[in-house]
């Protein structure tokens, strides 16, 4: 039975009990304790991005997933991933009915019931009730629905406060991105006003949706950035079809952290939300916060390069991975100004035009394959002997020595610069 059908079955043919939540509580923690007292089971309350807002303290029974959530103040990422895969979270985002969640031993999750808290058509958060010492009855499930309604107003107030904080942080982030704030002391002061410490190591990442960035997609991106535990996401803002985030690594391997986060984001956008046409890039990793603007410009440069050389750079995410592509714009401008002419490349291009051949592409793939004829022949889908013959003809036509690294690299660079003008 699907999670959605379970929810329908749970909420059917039940008479609403008296409301035990008609009296208001000042603190969300008190609400969690009261729900726990009424239902006689441990309770946790989370926001829509699975950050812990409150938990009941009256019960000693728990499970490893709940313990980790309380210690880390958020649901562990491995638990979130499992709940997506088993259909629990997708179901919670579609219905306001309670949903039973079966035990998942590998992430330390015992049986529980979950319910989402709604305001109109928007999910504000979730209540989780552990079924360790008892199984919730039909009447308990109705009580849980009343609890969700009682918690709604508390979460609305938190959301309003969060929105105001986000507006302040977005304005500050934009000033750094555009260079309007560039002094390190001013930046550190800005972080302090937001209740944060300036990062000791960081990079700017851009997630570009190649299409319209709708409000729904923006919420999905925000969900991914707030639930990740691969990097720290310090600041975020949206510009047109791009989500721009200031990230800080979590381990002593910052490049690995950032690349893994980029790969994970790309994968989850595809698997969870069916969003495939997306480009992700991050700039240099710096220790001084005064380089935020530079890291941002480098991330933009990566996206520009990925557009121009889509096939060659499809597995690249970072500015440091671009290699010679970092310098193509500068070289192209310099060579245009100097009226540069590559004799060998021009000879090959003329030969291709006259004979409807592809000698330039053959040479390009050969060099990209690190001059390995076996690898290059597979890329070109031709026999090794055919490739060897072509390489011999290329040497004759272009009058170059393909064993000379300098000559090979020069003509390869000019081939790439030619692509920029197409």
Swiss-Prot record:
Query: Transmembrane region positions?
Result: none
Asked whether the UniProt record includes DNA-binding among its keywords, one would answer yes
Q: Does the keyword Phosphoprotein apply?
A: no
Give a GO molecular function annotation for the protein.
Answer: DNA binding
- What keywords are annotated for this sequence in UniProt? Activator, DNA-binding, Sporulation, Transcription, Transcription regulation
Q: Which domain of life is it from?
A: Bacteria
* Pfam families found in the cross-reference section: CodY, GGDEF_2, HTH_30
Q: After gene disruption, what is the outcome? A: Disruption of adeR causes a sporulation defect.
The GO biological-process annotations, alphabetized, read as:
DNA-templated transcription; positive regulation of DNA-templated transcription; sporulation; sporulation resulting in formation of a cellular spore
> Of which family is this protein a member?
Belongs to the CdaR family.
Q: What does this protein do?
A: Activates ald expression in response to alanine availability and is important for normal sporulation in B.subtilis.
The protein, known as: DNA-binding transcriptional activator AdeR
The organism named in the record is Bacillus subtilis (strain 168)
Upper lineage ranks? Bacteria, Bacillati, Bacillota, Bacilli, Bacillales
Gene expressing this chain: adeR
